[in-house]
Amino acid sequence: MTDQTLSGRTAIVTGAGRGIGRAAALALAGAGADVALAARSEDQLERVAGEVEDLGRRALVVPTDVTDRDAVARLVTRTVEGLGGIDVLVNNSGVVDSTPLLAQEPEQWDRVFDTNVRGTYLATRAAGEHLVAQGSGKVVNIASNFAFKGVPGHAAYCASKAAVVAFTRTMSVEWARHNVQVNALAPGYVATDLNAELRADEEAQAKVLRSVPARRMGEPEEMAPWMVLLAGPASDFMTGETVVVDGGQTAR
């Protein structure tokens, strides 16, 4: 990205240390935004911060557990104090569990919902206080095409991402009069650490790719243009939408 669509703006990206979160942070920085980077791993965040700074933008590293209310509050406070405000929130932190329901312990279910749903709620609530007060802002929630599919062994993940889609729609209506747009991006299979084990199994990967008309997984960088669109002025009259980017898998 070389345009300055987001010049003068500040973004928070959760789960920013790798995969789609890293791609989002670099895309927003490439479009001119300063970026607060949040995730559990400080080492990963420091590497991404260096890449953001190489693009000429400021980066703020804030190790954060998005399921912890106080930690999320600190993330927002440090962003406002360190970078001067908040204009964009990207809720990307997420986990997956591939356990059939009858074998899945409640703790496994809770782990998925705590990160994917509670984490999205906490960050949106904390950042939203600033966005609503200033009368402008963007929230981009990372959902999944699994929100629209029944996938055996993924009840918790599918349900959690469907919750993110419903939350997106609700907050878009609630905050529309405050000029805050809330949209979601629903990737399909994208080559990240979340599916590294799957990709290491040639037979399992081949089975997955047969369900994708494009016959391949996406790359994190292919999500970047959508991040900039949903975080920038091109989406000023777009809210409550979930954009599916999955190589045609949901269209089948």
Model region roles, listed by residue range:
Residues 2, 149, 228, 239-252:
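Short C-terminal tail/terminal secondary-structure segment
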Residues 10, 17-19:
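Conserved glycine-rich cofactor-binding loop
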Residues 72, 100-101, 105-113, 208:
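Substrate-binding pocket helix/loop in short-chain dehydrogenase/reductase
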Residues 90, 176, 181, 238-240:
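Short, small/polar-rich loop/turn modules that mediate ligand/substrate recognition or access, typified
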Residues 124, 160, 168:
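Active-site helix of classical SDR
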Residues 129, 173-177, 236:
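Alpha-helical segment proximal to the catalytic Tyr-Lys
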Residues 144:
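Residue(s) in the substrate-gating loop at a strand-loop-helix junction
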